UniProtKB/Swiss-Prot annotation:
Subcellular location: Plastid, Chloroplast
Matching InterPro entries: RuBisCO, RuBisCo_large_chain_AS, RuBisCO_lsu_C, RuBisCO_lsu_C_sf, RuBisCO_lsu_fd_N, RuBisCO_lsu_N_sf, RuBisCO_lsuI
Catalytic residues (UniProt): K179, H297
Gene3D superfamilies: Ribulose bisphosphate carboxylase, large subunit, C-terminal domain, RuBisCO large subunit, N-terminal domain
Catalysed reactions listed for this entry: 2 (2R)-3-phosphoglycerate + 2 H(+) = D-ribulose 1,5-bisphosphate + CO2 + H2O; D-ribulose 1,5-bisphosphate + O2 = 2-phosphoglycolate + (2R)-3-phosphoglycerate + 2 H(+)
Gene Ontology molecular function: any one: magnesium ion binding
Protein name: Ribulose bisphosphate carboxylase large chain
Claim: ATP-binding is one of the keywords in the record: no
Domain of life: Eukaryota
Quaternary assembly: Heterohexadecamer of 8 large chains and 8 small chains.
Entry similarity comment: Belongs to the RuBisCO large chain family. Type I subfamily.
Binding site for substrate: N127, T177, K181, R298, H330, S382
Length: 488
């Protein structure tokens, strides 16, 4: 005699609890969980939907970013499900937002493919950000275990080797993005590069959206740029470079452009964040194998990193990109035109440069993390900065940084070379003051005025941009301390 539906369900329920049950009761919430050194840890900012318990929301995030689906499935019994389930183990209210919670989640290391940013992110940020139980969700920080970090190559070149290749130590490197970013012919583009490097800069660079457009094809740009680099290097006696953007529609085309850049003598190539994690790792491997510095422009990152309650904090992107193997990444200026709270930006720079991270809640660093001897990634500051801010830039960002003055070089009324010279003289005056033990931050304006007495281009720059400041309150600020904008 055929069994009824009710009888079949009763028999199945003897073997396992079926149906839809709360995530917290399925094992995805465990306040007594003891974190292992090998666990992948993630810190999410969770805004539950009205009426959803924060514990259940935390468990839902853990479940949907690991093994769960919307209902219990019997095939769980074919796995080590107790091991593979992510465990939300701590929920703290956000001090500045009563409807938000910091959720700590631990993942077993076996859930992730070795050496793959793509696989790591497919779990951690894959489906869960569209989950209905949460109103908003942001990945604030991660602790990548030592053993997992060892499966990544890290930066292709690193800060120390880059400085040795350039023979430039003890100061920030100086750069400039060619402006206008679109519309120049190859020959005019190369002229901008030559003028900037001859005036004292270390690098010129392509902007994120210069690839191979009708007004300037990539091969022409590379040839004219390298002519400018070589002439400026010969005239100055310094090693110079210009970031050649190899971003393209396919990996085959990226390789073609990178190989040509190497053939014409470039020391550095550039890619955009929008090419994707797998492509970034692939180009980092190529760069290491070919002794090339790899610059990453974070094009597109603010679409998901800027809003405080939803998306991915840039410190997490910084960790992923250091693992992936980029040598440079834009990481904020504090004083420029782009988003940048001083304390939060300091956390980004520490993430890229320190060999080991300590917990620093004001900076947004929630976990200790040893970088497992991966090389440092050099932060890049660009966007609305000029020579008159040099004391602030050195104070907030330190010396391991590339300071890129685009408009602050090319917008100089006496020309590109004069703009470059103004920046170089301002930097060297400030570094000298620092080395002499002076309070260069508070004395900065006077130090610059004194240097300008012997440098007409610097005086012109100070006169032109003296009143320029971008005093907007940052969108992404610390949850634990109040910080004013840097220029106030």
């Amino acid at each position: 005699m055929a069994q009824s539906v009710q009888e079949r369900t009763r028999l199945k329920n003897k073997r396992y609890e079926s149906g839809v049950i709360p995530y917290a009761k399925m094992g995805y919430w465990n306040p007594n969980y003891v974190v292992k050194d090998s666990d992948m840890l993630a810190l999410f900012r969770v805004t539950p939907q009205p009426g959803v318990d924060p514990i259940e929301a935390a468990a839902a995030v853990a479940g949907e970013s690991s093994t769960a689906t919307w209902t219990v499935v019997w095939t769980d019994l074919l796995t080590a499900c107790d091991v593979y389930r992510a465990k939300a183990y701590r929920v703290d209210p956000v001090p500045t937002a009563p409807d938000q919670y910091f959720v700590y989640i631990a993942y077993d290391i076996d859930l992730f493919e070795e050496g793959s940013i793509a696989n790591l992110t497919a779990s951690i940020i894959g489906n869960v950000f569209g989950f209905k139980a949460v109103k908003a969700l942001r990945l604030e920080d991660m602790r990548i275990p030592f053993s997992y970090l060892k499966t990544f190559q890290g930066p292709a070149t690193g800060v120390i080797v880059e400085r040795e290749r350039l023979n430039k130590f003890g100061r920030p490197l100086l750069g400039c993005t060619v402006k206008p970013k679109l519309g120049l012919s190859g020959k005019n583009y190369g002229r901008v590069v030559y003028e900037g490097l001859k005036g004292g800069l270390d690098f010129l660079k392509d902007d994120e959206n210069i690839n191979s457009q009708p007004f300037m094809r990539w091969r022409d740009r590379y040839l004219y740029v390298m002519e400018g680099v070589n002439r400026a290097a010969a005239a100055s006696g310094e090693v110079k470079g210009s970031y050649l953007n190899v971003t393209a529609a396919t990996m085959e085309e990226c390789y073609k452009r990178a190989e040509f850049a190497k053939e014409v003598g470039s020391v550095i190539i550039m890619i955009d964040l929008v090419i994707g994690y797998t492509a970034i790792q692939t180009m980092a491997i190529w760069a290491r194998e070919n002794n090339m510095i790899l610059h990453l422009h974070r094009a597109g990152n603010s679409t998901y990193s800027r809003q405080k309650n939803h998306g991915i904090n840039f410190r997490v992107i910084s960790k992923w990109m250091r693992m992936a193997g980029v040598d440079h990444i834009h990481a904020g200026t504090v004083v420029g035109k782009l988003e940048g709270d001083p304390i939060i930006i300091k956390g980004f720079y520490n993430t890229l440069l320190l060999p080991k991270l300590e917990v620093n809640l004001p900076q947004g660093l929630f976990f200790e993390m040893d970088w497992a001897s991966l090389r440092k990634t050099l932060p890049v500051a660009s966007g609305g900065i000029h020579a008159g801010q040099m004391h602030q830039l050195l104070h907030y960002l330190g010396e391991d940084v590339v300071l890129q003055f685009g408009g602050g070089t090319i917008g100089h009324p006496d020309g590109i070379q004069a703009g470059a010279t103004a920046n170089r003289v301002a930097l060297e005056a400030m570094v000298l003051a620092r080395n002499e033990g002076r309070d260069y931050f508070n004395e900065g304006p006077q130090i610059l005025r004194d240097a300008a007495k012997n440098c007409g281009p610097l005086q012109t720059a100070l006169d032109l941009w003296k009143d320029i400041a971008f005093n907007y309150t940052s969108t992404d600020t610390s949850d634990f301390v109040e910080t004013p904008t840097a220029n106030v």
